[in-house]
Regions:
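A recognition module on extended beta-rich or small alphabeta surfaces enriched in W/G with H and D/E
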Residues: 318-338
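Non-catalytic, well-ordered alpha-helical segments in soluble enzyme domains
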Residues: 266-279
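Sec-dependent signal peptide recognition
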Residues: 2-10
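Active-site neighborhood of thiol-dependent amide/isopeptide-bond enzymes
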Residues: 255-266, 283, 291
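Hydrophobic h-region of N-terminal signal peptides that target proteins for export
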Residues: 9-21
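Flexible, low-complexity junctional segments that flank or bridge functional domains
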Residues: 22-223, 238-239, 250-255, 276-280, ...
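Short, conserved, surface-exposed binding loops centered on an aromatic residue
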Residues: 243-249, 272
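Mature hydrolase/peptidase catalytic cores and their serpin-fold inhibitory cores, especially
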Residues: 226-242, 251, 262, 286-287
Length: 364
């Protein structure tokens, strides 16, 4: 959730170095499989839930992969299969999608099905009543809070009653990036699920990195250091409130437009909008990616080949323990769009946006 797209940018950069990693001697590389297993078992927030009632299957997987590595299988391909078994889009390495059941079961390759799929930040009038804000990333390196507020100011100055917030392609970043948009759509106090850390050295390092200079962060670190490794940190609030001191009179009606690439912080935006905005309807054809139950990721380099990486979530949503996780199926839209995919999605006003604009006018 937090900082995911920045992490993925690092991943892309690291991936460009993989050819050098292919030269790692097989005997040394094999220990990187053991490294992956160790860090998953002691630090991955999803490990207890993903292995529950599947202990024999998990043990057999590890044994088979170790035997295949000993027989000459590429170590890092085996690591990809190992991580893919957990079926978590936040737990990954190069090549994991080929083994992750969800990626195989629910492909969302819009680029292959459309003439051009490259959603870009844009804002413009759709028609006399409707304004479009396209917000395809929560990465603060891609868009600043000032730029987000400027888009909102342009919308309010337009005089349009209705708003389409198009987040197709938004794979995440940082939750704070969308806060001005959430404030704009807010019309009542809402409650959303919190998250909890699975205590480990990596989780402590994560808190220290992002909140270690705050009193609250230091207090959390102290409690984590008193908690046995592998347990979830007790005493955390299971929910949090979404509350602002005022409600914007516009938009009168709003649409949140999603697709199967929306994940992580993008999905958090969907959940928070649903929790606090009755005037907003979620539109889409596909469910979202389903990449939010386990989050707050750390990037790790393999000790034997430091050009290779793995990404690991340190927190679990409190909804998981209650059986309300979203990762298996993603978040469904309120209204399913049955139109064909648009030919192009860049900075244009596409067919879906025009259809949604008309539908907003017909709502009671």
């Amino acid at each position: 959730m937090k900082t995911l797209l920045r992490v993925l940018s690092l991943v892309a950069a690291v991936a460009g170095l993989l050819s050098a990693g292919a030269q790692t001697p097989a005997g040394r590389a094999a220990s990187d499989f053991d490294f992956a297993v160790d860090v998953v078992e002691r630090a991955y927030a999803g490990y207890p839930d993903k292995t529950a009632n599947r202990g024999a299957e998990y043990a057999a997987l590890k044994e088979r992969l170790q035997q295949e590595i000993a027989s000459g299988r590429d170590t890092y391909d085996a690591v990809a299969e190992y991580l893919g078994w957990f079926d978590d889009s936040h737990l990954g390495t190069e090549g994991v999608r080929a083994y992750r059941p969800k990626s195989i079961r629910r492909p969302s390759d819009y680029a292959a099905r459309m003439e051009r799929y490259y959603p870009q930040f844009t804002h413009c009038r759709v028609d006399r009543e409707t304004y479009l804000i396209r917000f395809p990333s929560c990465d603060p390196d891609w868009i600043s809070l000032g730029e987000v507020r400027e888009m909102i100011e342009k919308y309010l100055a337009s005089g349009c009653e209705n708003l389409i917030l198009d987040i197709r392609g938004n794979g995440g970043g940082n939750d704070s990036s969308y806060e001005p948009l959430l404030r704009l759509l807010y019309d009542h106090e809402g409650v959303e699920d919190g998250m909890e850390y699975r205590v480990s050295d990596l989780a402590i390092a994560h808190v220290r990195k992002f909140a270690g200079d705050t009193e609250r962060g230091r207090a959390k670190i102290a409690r984590m250091e008193r908690t046995p490794a592998g347990e979830f940190l007790a005493g955390e609030s299971k929910t949090y409130r979404i509350r602002y001191d005022s409600v914007s009179p516009r938009p009168r009606r709003a649409a949140l437009l999603i697709d199967g690439k929306v994940g992580s912080s993008g999905e958090q935006l969907v959940l928070e909008v649903r929790a606090c905005s009755r005037r907003t309807t979620v539109y889409g054809q596909d469910n979202t990616l389903g990449c939010l139950d386990f989050s707050n990721c750390e990037i790790l380099r393999f000790p034997q080949d430091t050009t290779r990486w793995m990404m690991l979530p340190t927190t679990r949503s409190c909804r998981v323990a209650e059986g309300r996780g979203i990762d298996a199926a993603g978040i469904a839209p309120d209204v399913r769009i049955t139109l064909p995919l648009p030919e192009t999605l860049t900075d244009n006003v596409d067919e879906w946006v025009r259809w949604v604009a008309e539908d907003l006018k017909t709502e009671n």
